[in-house]
Amino acid sequence: IVTLDGEDVIDCEPILGYLHRGMEKIAENRTIIQYLPYVTRWDYLATMFTEAITVNAPEFLENIQIPQRASYIRVIMLELSRIASHLLWL
């Protein structure tokens, strides 16, 4: 909750827990591809990880085989995302 005086912020009271609010309900009426932009908002520091788990689960359940090159690219992107997340805190 933010209290403003014109454009100046007077007080700010953070309320935790609203980042994921309603995400499950939004997912009910969308395909996986339509839902991916919402998934990246779960954790804005690790967007590749949230996208990977969202895409890997249906691929595993349906026994979908992705090309080996795509698998390597995913691993590289996940590692770069992990490194960037660690560097943020230095």
Curated annotation (Swiss-Prot):
InterPro entries: NADH_UbQ_OxRdtase_49kDa_CS, NDH1_su_D/H, NiFe-Hase_large. It is found in: Plastid, Chloroplast thylakoid membrane. PROSITE patterns: COMPLEX1_49K. Keywords: Chloroplast, Membrane, NAD, NADP, Plastid, Plastoquinone, Quinone, Thylakoid, Translocase, Transport. It comes from the Eukaryota. GO terms for molecular function: oxidoreductase activity, acting on NAD(P)H; quinone binding. Its EC number is 7.1.1.-. It is an enzyme of class 7 (translocase). Signal peptide: none annotated. Gene3D superfamilies: Cytochrome-c3 Hydrogenase, chain B (1.10.645.10). It is a peripheral membrane protein. One of its GO terms (cellular component) is chloroplast thylakoid membrane. It catalyses: a plastoquinone + NADH + (n+1) H(+)(in) = a plastoquinol + NAD(+) + n H(+)(out); a plastoquinone + NADPH + (n+1) H(+)(in) = a plastoquinol + NADP(+) + n H(+)(out). Its main location: plastid. NDH is composed of at least 16 different subunits, 5 of which are encoded in the nucleus. NDH shuttles electrons from NAD(P)H:plastoquinone, via FMN and iron-sulfur (Fe-S) centers, to quinones in the photosynthetic chain and possibly in a chloroplast respiratory chain. The immediate electron acceptor for the enzyme in this species is believed to be plastoquinone. Couples the redox reaction to proton translocation, and thus conserves the redox energy in a proton gradient. Belongs to the complex I 49 kDa subunit family. This is NAD(P)H-quinone oxidoreductase subunit H, chloroplastic. It comes from Secale cereale. The gene is ndhH.
